Every structure is written in C-alpha cells, then in structure tokens.
Amino acid sequence: MSLDIDQIALHQLIKRDEQTLDVVLRDSLLPTNAVVEEMMAELHRVYSAKSKAYGLFNEQSELADALKRSRKGDEDFLSFSRAATGRLRDELAKYPFAEGGVVLFCQYRYLAVEYLLISVLSSCHSMRVNEQLDLSTTHYLDINRADIVARIDLTEWETNPESTRYLTFLTGRVGRKVSDFFMDFLSAAEGLDTKAQNRGLLQAVDDYCADAELGKNERQAYRQQVYSYCNEQLQAGEEIALQVLAQELPKLGEKDFQQFSAEQGYALEESFPADRGTLRQLTKFAGSGGGLSINFDALLLDERIFWDAATDTLTIKGTPPNLRDQLQRRAGSK
C-alpha cells in the first residue's frame, strides 16, 4: 500500500462521569515508524471499505479556518490538533453516547492525494501469552470497529473548493447521532447524497429501457449489465462514471445512456460512489417486516413469483428445497 505519513498526532479523551470528558494532550507529534505505518494502513483500509456520508465546510467553520492556517504554515500541526481536540471534546460531550478514546489526527498521502483523517479510537482489553506461557492483560486499539472517523480530501478541497464531496464521515453504529456530532465538530453541511445519486441512476435506467420499449427479459438483461459494471466499480473502490457506463451499454435508439440521462434532468454527477443496497435493486427484490423477510431475483417475478396488487399478496410456485424440508418436518410433527 502506497501510503506516506506526513504528520500524525495522538491525544486522549477520558470519560470521568456522565457529564465530564477530560482531555490529555500529547506534547509532540508521534514519530513515524513501522508500527505507526502499519496502524495507519489498517485504518485507511477499514475506512475505505465502509459506507460514508459526504459533506463540505460551512463558511464559518472554525476547524476549516484552523486547517487553512496550518496548511499555510501559520500554525504547526501539533497546535492545530491540540486545539481541535478541545473542540472535539466540547461537541462530543453534548451527546449521551459520548465515550472516551484515543483521538488521532493524521495527514498522509495515498496515490498522490493528500488526506487529513480524524478519528476517535476505542481501546479494548484482552489477554496475551508471553514466551514463558504466562498470561497478562493488554490493551489494543479497536480499529476494525472504528466508527467515529472523518476524512478530508485536502487535494480536492484546495483545488476545487466548490466541491460537495471533499469531506467524508461514517454514520456509525449509533446511526444519525454520530453524523450529527461530526457535522457539529467540523462545522459542515451535507454534501453529495450518494443514495440519491444511485436512486437517480436506477430511475434513469428504467426510463431509458421504457423509452426504447424493451420487453421484460430485455429490460432485465439491460439492468444486469448496469449492475455488473457498477458492482465491479464498487468492488474496486472506484466510482460509477456515467461516460464509461454509457460506453459499456448498448445504445438504445438515437441517444446513448449518458445523453438520455443528461437531457431528462436526473441531476446525476459525472461520477459518484456506488451504493451497494440501492444497486442491488437492479437485480433483486427484497424486503422485511412483521417477522417476514423476502429476497428473490427480479427475473422470477411473473415466472415463479406473482404479486396481486389488489390484495397485496405474493404467490410463490416452487419453494427452495431447504425451506420445503423445514415446512414438511413442521407439518409432520403436528
């Protein structure tokens, strides 16, 4: 992994009671060595693999102003990180889910792009066995479960300040509250809506197929082609590029897919991140609720699975063998 650490600082938040978060500030930057590089490579990998929300700084963002001063050399990185940790404590303390942790600020380069990553990492307790086979307690940073993380694409921010996607953050296991916390700390507003972009893509595909009057099987085959490209991009960690997608797809009528989507006003970006859950709707129907969970290939609709809209009833012809076996055993036990 081509990841080069420029500067990294660690501080700590300690929860004393329900209302108090104390700050412990480090007096120097963390020296870059093999252990630090391995930690950052793992954190970068974990963060890159998770779903993220996008944002951009508000005009009055204190953190953005401080970061600009640091980038210009008017304030050193350590001072920037110490002041930001204080603001982080003030914002985090407002929320009931607030916990202590190690606060990490790392400025690094990856594939010619500069990033600033900010994270609050939890410490976990575990056991270790030494060479004498004695047991002792140990602590480690729970990087794989990190959910309080934000990252600023410094290259994008400085070269394209009008962008709506240079700032990303995780929604976290406690949902929207973590998003709100980061928005407050970063003084940021919501940016690119990834799910909306993906929903717009799906609508554009359906409308394009309908405009060409494709039959059911042809339409589903077209959706499958769209899904194959988008899923490849998702697996590679790359964005969906409309121009490339249009080149991959057969042209229907006089206009290719990119021309059609631009003229019909779907407000799609030239490229945007793939959203796994939304894209799955290209090839599958899925839903759950009331103790029922259903997931089936779209091709099965009107073939083996039939929906009666008037009565809101699904009829399934031919159940999966493992399900049928369970039903037969249950029926036989009565």
From Swiss-Prot:
It is found in: Cytoplasm, Nucleoid. Pfam families: NA37. Signal peptide: none annotated. GO terms for molecular function: double-stranded DNA binding; single-stranded RNA binding. The keyword Cytoplasm applies. Keywords: Cytoplasm. One of its GO terms (cellular component) is bacterial nucleoid. Belongs to the YejK family. PANTHER family: NUCLEOID-ASSOCIATED PROTEIN YEJK, PTHR38772. This is Nucleoid-associated protein YPN_2714.
